[in-house]
Amino acid sequence: MPTVLSRMAMQLKKTAWIIPVFMVSGCSLSPAIPVIGAYYPSWFFCAIASLILTLITRRVIQRANIKLAFVGIIYTALFALYAMLFWLAFF
């Protein structure tokens, strides 16, 4: 009668082939978007959209008259957050 560890080892052997599949799933063509005959990387568009959304957020915070400490860190973090969310949502 197999023990719990041997059952886990057998199950791991059955599913071990999945690990290399996930490791090479990123080895595809670079996502590029053609704009007027030139190809631009998709991260460029995520950065532009993130910059626009960060500026809108800044304007909303200014109009609400909210005072923030560490403004540079906060807006940099918002820029990075928005860029990653755009990348996750659209690419």
Swiss-Prot record:
It is a lipid-anchor; Multi-pass membrane protein. One of its GO terms (cellular component) is plasma membrane. A lipid is attached at residue 27 (S-diacylglycerol cysteine). It is found in: Cell membrane; Membrane. Residues 1-26 form the signal peptide. InterPro entries: YtcA. A lipid is attached at residue 27 (N-palmitoyl cysteine). Keywords: Cell membrane, Lipoprotein, Membrane, Palmitate, Signal, Transmembrane, Transmembrane helix. The chain crosses the membrane at residues 33-53, 70-90. Belongs to the YtcA family. This is Uncharacterized protein YtcA. It comes from Escherichia coli O157:H7. The lineage of its organism: Bacteria, Pseudomonadati, Pseudomonadota, Gammaproteobacteria, Enterobacterales.
